[in-house]
């Protein structure tokens, strides 16, 4: 990975202040409860000086109270929930994001549908068990309607669903 290559390069050049960098990995199984346990071990036992990850917003949300309490910076490479870096209007001091947010994605999708695809009537199928999916659908709907588009159908499903006939029949 790019991180490993960068660490190798720094270490070959003598490290930082003569100290070699090391990567400590931990699998949180993309489960918030596991993420909390995983980051607790990284911070309290492995004594890491920074955390890169987790991948999902839910896992980052479970990790940030632990990293923040221990003043360990956490870089969220792909957690897109708006409250990852800001909560109640206040910037979280030890949490950083290196990607866009859910509202940005929903807006860009609607703008693309309007400008590039010239779509005016839209049906939305979203995962009601996912804050990510619900957030995208909400912002997409708002932006599309502001641009004069019409949401002709909005149907929810659950991630565990295997049959989408009912929702698709309603949209048709």
Could you describe each region identified by the protein language model?
Residues 9, 13, 41, 111-116, ...:
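A generic secondary-structure signal
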Residues 166-172:
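Short amphipathic alpha-helix with an adjacent loop that forms part of the alpha/beta core around
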Residues 2, 6, 38, 108-109, ...:
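Hydrophobic alpha-helical segments typical of transmembrane helices
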Residues 31-35, 59, 102-106, 133-136, ...:
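Conserved donor sugar-nucleotide recognition element shared by glycan-biosynthetic enzymes
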Residues 92-159:
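An alpha-beta-alpha
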Residues 1, 13-86, 157-162:
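Beta-alpha junction/loop-to-helix N-cap segments that form part of ligand/metal-binding clefts
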Residues 62-66, 139, 167:
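A short acidic, amphipathic alpha-helical/loop segment
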Residues 1-17, 138-146:
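Short, polar/charged alpha-helical segment
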